Amino acid sequence: MIRKFLIVLIIAYQRYISPFTAPSCRFYPSCSEYARQSLIKYGLIKGVVKTCGRLCRCHPFHPGGYDPV
């Protein structure tokens, strides 16, 4: 239930907020898409842990690149 709620929040962010902000994610897929995919693939706890790790790596000093779920 919480997992589905988080996925809905991510989708809402992707549709209604992200288009109005400058692209800043250094990875492909984007951090929000990575979070959505990891919640679907791994469930709530492991998905949140993997998302937090990804967000910690998404900064100007990291080269970024392709980082699949």
Swiss-Prot record:
Keywords: Cell inner membrane, Cell membrane, Membrane
Key word Cell membrane present: yes
Listed transmembrane segments: none
Entry-linked Pfam families: YidD (PF01809)
SMART domains per record: Haemolytic
A cellular component term, taken from the record's GO annotations: plasma membrane
Signal peptide region: none
Keyword Cell membrane in record: yes
Subcellular localization: Cell inner membrane
Topology in membrane: Peripheral membrane protein
Highest taxon above the source species: Bacteria
Family: Belongs to the UPF0161 family.
PANTHER family: MEMBRANE PROTEIN INSERTION EFFICIENCY FACTOR-RELATED (PTHR33383:SF1)
Protein name: Putative membrane protein insertion efficiency factor
Naturally occurring in which organism (per UniProt): Syntrophotalea carbinolica (strain DSM 2380 / NBRC 103641 / GraBd1) (Pelobacter carbinolicus)
